[in-house]
Amino acid sequence: MKIKRLDISNYRSLDGLSFSFHSEVNFIVGLNNIGKSNLLKLLNTLVNKRNFIDEDFNDIEKSIEIKITLFLDEDEIGVFEDLFDPTNERQINIIALQENPDVNITFIHAETETVISSSLIKKLNFIYYDSLRKPSNELNFNTKTGSGRFLSHLIDLYTKNDEKVQPEDLINNTYLAGLLDYINSKLELIETFEANDIKADTGNEIKEILSRLIILKNDENFPVDKLGYGIQFSNLVPISILERIFNIKRRKKTFENAIITDGNGTVTLPITLGLDEPEIHLHPHLQRKLSFTHLKVPFSHSNIFIIS
């Protein structure tokens, strides 16, 4: 399932504009403040959010209306049941309509005005990576937000079946006890620490301890947060994709809505990746390499293909 065309009405600076997309890779080029980021934010809202907010309305007195033309792969015909473009059964025209900021987006088949479930739009699985995200904040095992959730999940998977392991099994208690005594002897001199009885101690959870012990390094022993932004960014993108799969897979109904199964039983999970201002992190060669590296990634153990 791919977005073939957008016709936009009353959305930010893109009011009255239309965009046609290539089936594989698209590059949005233009002057500063011309609306490139707005296009990615529009796609993110359509797929991942329930409604547009006040600042999305070019004219607050008018509704936002987006005509979305989707092109379906052969195996996806029938996803929208008997709704399709009368001139092409592999194409469907959908109107995304929101009358004001206080209501949700409604999706309607353009030709018949039949309401379409937003869960079908979510099958596009759009991943939006804006230019303000800092890769080093997510490429670690000690974060519960963003793409770092996937890395922390790897620790969860390993430890959940090994309940016998205790924190003291991982740490030299004699050395640690001396360290804690030393730290607390200094902290107790701080009046607020002393008044609130706050002291340094070890974590009680194995996962908590391990997530602080493990870091990502290269073969020259440099931590990933000390490497160049290009390396951090290019490694964060596949982690972002895997985090999205993990997030979808953990909710059975969401996963069933997201995947597409053909007649041979092959399961497909479409992914659309939107990178805002990749030139901040990547030189042109790495941008091209990244764009084509993630077109198709096989997971042989589950027969899932990620297609962006």
Model feature map: region roles:
Residues 1-48, 221-308:
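Switch/communication elements of ASCE P-loop NTPase nucleotide-binding domains
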Residues 66-68, 102-109, 212-217:
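Short polybasic amphipathic segments
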Residues 40-87:
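Conserved P-loop NTP-binding catalytic core
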Residues 54-56, 74-170:
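Glycine-rich phosphate-binding loops of NTPases
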Residues 2, 15, 62-66, 90-92, ...:
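Residues at beta-strand starts and edge strands
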Residues 138-144, 148-275, 284:
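Extended helical coiled-coil dimerization/tether regions that scaffold
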Residues 5-7, 18, 65-69, 93-95, ...:
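Beta-strand secondary-structure signal
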Residues 9, 22, 69-73, 132:
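Solvent-exposed residues in well-ordered beta-strands and their adjoining turns
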